[in-house]
Swiss-Prot record:
The gene is purM. Gene3D superfamilies: PurM-like C-terminal domain, PurM-like, N-terminal domain. SUPFAM superfamilies: PurM C-terminal domain-like, PurM N-terminal domain-like. Pathway: Purine metabolism; IMP biosynthesis via de novo pathway; 5-amino-1-(5-phospho-D-ribosyl)imidazole from N(2)-formyl-N(1)-(5-phospho-D-ribosyl)glycinamide: step 2/2. Belongs to the AIR synthase family. Keywords: ATP-binding, Cytoplasm, Ligase, Nucleotide-binding, Purine biosynthesis. This is Phosphoribosylformylglycinamidine cyclo-ligase. One of its GO terms (cellular component) is cytosol.
Length: 345
């Protein structure tokens, strides 16, 4: 390698080592439709092997946001990749698409092979949970752009669905019920507010033992985002799902309307599902309003599902058979917007 390039802060040999270390993680995500191996200029996937009549490709890209800063502080890098995958695949499965493959982008100030491997391990873990192949990626060492202990992670997911099976929300009508699938915690949104309230304003540390949580604060906050792919795909086989929404940035107020036809809204019954204690801890510590909480956080619901009232019992049973819980958390209304009923003030 070029000594001059290394003196400029780019260690190509470290990059080669990182690639070698990540191979075993990439290989465990393989699907039979993947063509070629690690190291090609582009990842290849044989779409014809799916035997679809009218395949529609659905794609999504996302990152992890400032949750990364907690990983830096805790020097724990093996779960943040799950978050990157979850944010992408949960977005495309709500259209009815099965995630097929994933690509990652890691930018760092210094290429540390063990750290890169830990990140990719998490990405591979997420891909396994979603059933998609990790077919490519980029690791960019960018001295001067990032501190040596810092990095950013983004991902790109592509899935496919038969055109006739696209979930568009077009058939949703007033009176339909909204089911909620529980989240694993804060997921990957709202961390700038979390850090401000808990770490900066009130002096908690990531090592603080929080009695209400039964664990250290950092352990709770770094809990990976739940991946709903397998539950959703199995539930879609009922043919009864009218709409789906991934509750991410913007909370209920922004994400629930995204699945509804124009002119319709939703009434959400706060108290109809168990809210994880982390949200009460954030709310009480920061003295936040219901509007603040529901427009920033998932509040314990990571995925919303719309079904008719007649179909709700059958769909709930199907969800439960996948090992997931489901709660009736509200209903569709004939007035646009989201109303949170029974919420704290």
């Amino acid at each position: 390698m070029s000594d001059a390039y290394k003196q400029a802060g780019v260690d190509i040999e470290a990059g080669y080592e990182a690639v070698a270390r990540m191979k075993k993680h990439v290989l465990r995500t393989a699907r039979p439709e993947v063509i070629g191996g690690l190291g090609s200029f582009g990842g290849m996937f044989d779409l014809s092997a799916l035997n679809m009549k009218e395949p529609v490709l659905v794609s999504g890209t996302d990152g992890v946001g400032t949750k990364l800063m907690l990983a830096f502080q805790m020097n724990k890098h093996d779960t943040i990749g799950v978050d990157a995958v979850a944010m992408c695949v949960n977005d495309i499965v709500v259209q009815g698409a099965e995630p097929l493959y994933f690509l990652d982008y890691i930018a760092c100030g210094k290429s540390e092979p063990a750290r890169i491997e830990a990140i990719v391990k998490g990405i591979a873990d997420g891909c396994e949970q979603a059933g998609c192949a990790l077919i490519g990626g980029e690791t960019a060492e960018m001295p001067g752009m990032y501190d040596e202990t810092e990095y950013d992670v983004a991902g790109f997911a592509v899935g496919a669905v038969e055109k006739a099976d696209l979930v568009t929300g077009a058939d949703i009508e007033s009176g339909d019920l909204i089911l909620g699938l529980p989240s694993s915690g804060v997921h990957s949104n709202g961390f700038s507010l979390v850090r401000k309230i808990l770490l900066h304003d009130h002096g908690y540390t990531l090592d603080s033992e929080i009695p209400a949580l039964g664990k250290k604060l950092g352990e709770e906050l770094l809990t990976p985002t739940k991946i709903y792919v397998k539950t959703v795909l199995q539930t879609l086989k009922t043919g009864k799902v009218k709409g789906l929404s991934h509750i991410t940035g913007g909370g209920f107020y922004e994400n629930v309307p995204r699945m509804l036809p124009e002119g319709l809204g939703a009434e959400i019954d706060y108290g109809s599902w168990p809210v994880p204690p982390i949200f009460s801890f954030i709310r009480e510590t920061g003295q936040l309003s219901a509007k603040d909480m529901f427009s920033t956080f998932n509040m314990g619901i990571g995925m919303a599902v719309v079904v008719s009232s007649d179909d709700a019992p059958h769909v709930i049973r199907q969800i439960q058979e996948t090992g997931e819980d489901a709660y009736i958390i509200g209903r569709v209304t004939d007035t646009s917007g989201v109303v949170i009923g029974g919420a704290f003030e």
